[in-house]
């Protein structure tokens, strides 16, 4: 009986020691990249830039003029945008602070429509090509076919002009220096 208890205690100690050793190795030897080590992007990711141009061209073939209103956005620009409706005048337009948006990593664009006379149109029901389909949704369909995720599909904060390609990376991973490949 005493032998059994001693054996259980030793197995328990061995298990605790193993967990402790693994934790020690993880903390001291597995170092994730840090933003200080990986320079932040300064432009739109090449794949996103290419898909943006394809989106504009494919929409034009359907008689829809698309204008890109935002693409890469610096952390400072993001912080200023975040302040709108909070400490700066205007409506709240984002819940993402600097470094928390896919725009800050060159992985997102915002679009609008443009009329033939050059007016930027935010009307999601606008039908300039007269095919009885909302141009906005036609652009969204093209974008999704190209691999973009649409902010209008989000459940929390719908961002109808927003299109992004996250390449399976979270903001947390991007903040720690992970980057998508430069090509598809």
Regions found by a protein language model. Give the residues of each.
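Hydrophobic membrane-insertion alpha-helices, especially the h-region
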Residues: 8-26
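Signal peptide cleavage region of secreted peptide precursors
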Residues: 26-32
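Extracytoplasmic/secreted proteins, especially bacterial periplasmic and envelope-associated proteins
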Residues: 47-50, 54, 76, 134-138, ...
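Electropositive
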Residues: 82-92
């Amino acid at each position: 009986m005493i032998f059994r208890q001693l054996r259980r205690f030793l197995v328990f100690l061995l298990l605790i020691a193993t967990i402790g050793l693994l934790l020690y190795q993880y903390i001291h030897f597995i170092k994730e990249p840090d933003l200080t080590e990986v320079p932040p992007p300064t432009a739109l990711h090449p794949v996103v830039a290419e898909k943006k141009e394809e989106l504009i061209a494919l929409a034009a073939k359907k008689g829809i003029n698309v204008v890109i209103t935002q693409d890469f956005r610096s952390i400072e620009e993001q912080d200023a945008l975040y302040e709108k409706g909070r400490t700066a005048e205007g409506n709240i337009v984002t819940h993402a602070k600097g470094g928390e948006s896919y725009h800050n990593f060159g992985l997102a664009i915002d679009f609008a429509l443009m009329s033939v006379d050059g007016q930027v149109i935010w009307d999601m029901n606008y039908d300039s090509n007269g095919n009885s389909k909302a141009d906005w949704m036609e652009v969204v369909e093209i974008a999704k076919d190209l691999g973009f995720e649409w902010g209008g599909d989000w459940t929390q904060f719908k961002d109808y002009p927003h299109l992004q390609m996250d390449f399976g990376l979270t903001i947390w991973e991007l903040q720690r220096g992970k980057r998508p490949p430069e090509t598809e």
